[in-house]
Amino acid sequence: MRILVNGAGVAGLTVAWQLYRHGFRVTLAERAGTVGAGASGFAGGMLAPWCERESAEEPVLTLGRLAADWWEAALPGHVHRRGTLVVAGGRDTGELDRFSRRTSGWEWLDEVAIAALEPDLAGRFRRALFFRQEAHLDPRQALAALAAGLEDARMRLTLGVVGESDVDHDRVVDCTGAAQIGRLPGLRGVRGEMLCVETTEVSLSRPVRLLHPRHPIYIVPRDKNRFMVGATMIESDDGGPITARSLMELLNAAYAMHPAFGEARVTETGAGVRPAYPDNLPRVTQEGRTLHVNGLYRHGFLLAPAMAGEVARRLLTEQGQPERRAS
């Protein structure tokens, strides 16, 4: 079966990879000149289903807990399994108790244990929650590696094109995300803003979430002394540059985590529109010969593998073939 996948963000790339591994003939098309040009490129890359359960429905945990294994199988060496640390400032320590009641899979840490995990946070927080089973990856590196793997496998990847003709394909899988807002019923945009900083004065080994009643943030370590700080959530489909207010909120929160971030160089700011359905859960829907994969909201890297698996199951069932294990 010949499949056209439109959109080379995290949804399109994972779908293309999964279908290729199942033996489908896949063409991947992307309007932009690069992969991950939309919201996927501004993601944190946290594979954190237990933490996300704090404000998400149960499927985020049940589907998302398989994501780290999927990414490790597809891209060996790209997944960092170091857990997630969740902290709160002195006046906000009650947020930790609230967070613990709404999640599972954590263990309490005292000051000594925090310092053992993250020496640069020694003495800054009295207690923390540690989600040992969680992981993270660098989104842009992962997307580029997935695209390179598909090209090495001689799968057709076309970038910077308006759109491939679907006439020569048996099925189309649309993974164009926010481009479908206003077209797919119930799909809306949620704006997310982030920034990247660079400093040699702070070292972190894992994502750290700083809880706050109004402005919770996370900081994800990257390579070369870089950190991604995110992310706002605004009910809007405005994809324009980051606002001054959001920039100040993110920088102030990073400074509250460690004052050395006040001297960090801001190397990038960005904003993306995350497509979401009313329940904030992704869906695979069908419209004629087209399957739509959309609504990944803030869970792109966490839930895209599960959505790719669902697409593969549907197409294999249509062909009358049993699903075989694919990475």
UniProtKB/Swiss-Prot annotation:
Role, per record: May have amino acid oxidase activity in the biosynthesis of thiazole when cysteine gives its thiol group to be inserted into the thiazole molecule and the rest of the molecule is deaminated to give pyruvic acid and ammonia.
GO cellular component assignments: cytoplasm
GO aspect biological process, one term: thiamine biosynthetic process
GO molecular function, one term: oxidoreductase activity
Keyword Ion transport: no
The name this protein goes by in its record: Putative thiamine biosynthesis oxidoreductase ThiO
Keywords of this entry: Oxidoreductase, Plasmid, Thiamine biosynthesis
InterPro entries assigned to the protein according to its UniProt record, in alphabetical order: FAD-dep_OxRdtase, FAD/NAD-bd_sf, Gly_oxidase_ThiO
UniProt xrefs under NCBIfam families: thiamin_ThiO
Highest taxon listed in the record's lineage: Bacteria
Gene3D superfamilies recorded: D-Amino Acid Oxidase, subunit A, domain 2 (3.30.9.10), FAD/NAD(P)-binding domain (3.50.50.60)
Annotated pathway: Cofactor biosynthesis; thiamine diphosphate biosynthesis
A Pfam match: DAO
Keyword Oxidoreductase appears in the UniProt entry: yes
